Amino acid sequence: MGTDAAGHVARSTIRPYSETPNVTRGGAPMRTFLRTADGVAIDSVYEPGGVVHDPGNVVYEQAEEGSRNGSGNAVPSVSQGLVLVVAHGFTGDADRPHVRRVAQVFARYGAVVTFSFRGHGRSGGRSTVGDREVLDLAAAVAWARELGHTRVVTVGFSMGGSVVLRHAALDTGDVEAVVSVSAPARWFYRGTAPMRRLHWLVTRPSGRLVGRYGLRTRIHHRQWDPVPLSPVEAVPRITPAPLLVVHGDQDAYFPLDHPRMLADAAGEHGELWVEPGMGHAENAAPEPLLRRIGDWAVARAG
């Protein structure tokens, strides 16, 4: 697994249609493809904060290569403060309603970057179910920094929750704080029926066909080699960045021993919120919880 900072492709900036409401805090929303360190195009959306637009109402615009920001045009004025980079769960993407809902809540606290992991949505490549996805997140974080943001908080759900942990461990100092929601602590867990179904989806040719045509997720056929650092192994390497672990007590995928292992590994740098009645990942995260996460991010990112 390479840990170099992700590179960038020629950026395709977006412009809102004329009827789109003005964005508060200055700047305009953008949508672009980023290039990861291993050459995968990642569909990414930037919202300056205050108002989140429907990403379907913006268009890609081919930009010139070679400038500092990947385009011949000046980057719009943006906040120099907090940005929340959202990493969705397996089978999600930047256009999914639950991801847009998360972005809408987080926009009250700062700018928001959402993106589609490889093999998901409009992004290229095929999903490696949390392995090389760390490079996708690295590209999104680098983009946020390039746009001028000095405080970055990554927020990941399920698969994305494991990715934000490994990214922070591999790129120490690249983020100010990390939030991991509904994440596994260890790999290859098959202790619940949903996880057994997921392993069938990922490891069997027939399962990958279901993933492609039923779930709009293109899954790589190769097994991990080598096996990446597990989430619980990654957590101690995140320090001194603060870590928030969030998990629902009704999560059907990963029981509560997973978040407790992560919190124990974090020691004094970690917090654990066990949410009564909550199920799994962004689909199950209620708005009050998302607001509490936003408050935590503002407080911990400095």
Describe these PLM feature segments.
Residues G2-V51, Y60, G72-P76:
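N-terminal cap/lid segment of alpha/beta-hydrolase-fold proteins
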Residues F90-A103:
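The serine-hydrolase catalytic nucleophile loop
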Residues T128-L147:
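Alpha/beta-hydrolase active-site loop
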Residues G173-W224:
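Hydrolase active-site cap/lid region
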Residues I238-T239, V245-H247:
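Short beta-strand/loop motif that positions the catalytic acidic residue
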Residues A252-H258:
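Conserved alpha/beta-hydrolase "acid-adjacent" motif
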Residues M278-L290:
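Catalytic histidine-centered segment of alpha/beta-hydrolase-like enzymes
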